[in-house]
């Protein structure tokens, strides 16, 4: 019995002393849209849903996400770059997680790239186009996806 306890304790101690070697990944530089398109071709890219609470409050806004397109053609390491309504950031992240890319012939090694996308949320009132001029200045990113909400009021 003592031998079993001693062996168990010894195994526990040696297991605790084992240290895993940490892997240090070199951060990827941000690629411009031309570079991203040279390496990856979008397969599926849905626009984000307009958050219900934001459209009911007639709020417009934007959010920019930075992410890595990994070797499998999926977004990972997603990070919100701009402070915005949480609902806009959440909707953008949900959409981005569904996107998929295919490596181009120039990227036969499926090398990952870092990219960013600006998600704009604008409201059209009674069919009038929304004004998005300020959104591009508030949220960075050459790549842009717009979600449009529609509000109709009776006159």
Roles of regions detected by a PLM:
Residues 16-155:
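Charge-biased low-complexity segments
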Residues 1-16:
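Sec-dependent bacterial lipoprotein signal peptides
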């Amino acid at each position: 019995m003592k031998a079993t306890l001693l062996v168990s304790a010894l195994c526990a101690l040696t297991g605790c002393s084992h240290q895993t070697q940490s892997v240090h990944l070199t951060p990827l530089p941000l690629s411009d849209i031309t570079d991203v398109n040279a390496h990856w071709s979008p397969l599926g890219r849905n626009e984000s849903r307009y958050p219900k609470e934001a459209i009911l409050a007639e709020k417009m806004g934007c959010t920019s996400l930075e992410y890595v397109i990994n070797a499998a053609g999926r977004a990972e390491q997603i990070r919100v770059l701009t402070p915005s309504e949480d609902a806009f950031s959440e909707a953008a992240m949900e959409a981005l997680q569904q996107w998929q890319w295919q490596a181009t012939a120039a990227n036969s090694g499926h090398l990952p790239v870092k990219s960013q996308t600006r998600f704009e949320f604008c409201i059209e009132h009674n069919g009038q186009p929304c004004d998005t001029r300020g959104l591009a200045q508030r949220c960075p990113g050459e790549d842009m996806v717009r979600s449009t909400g529609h509000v109709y009021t009776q006159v």
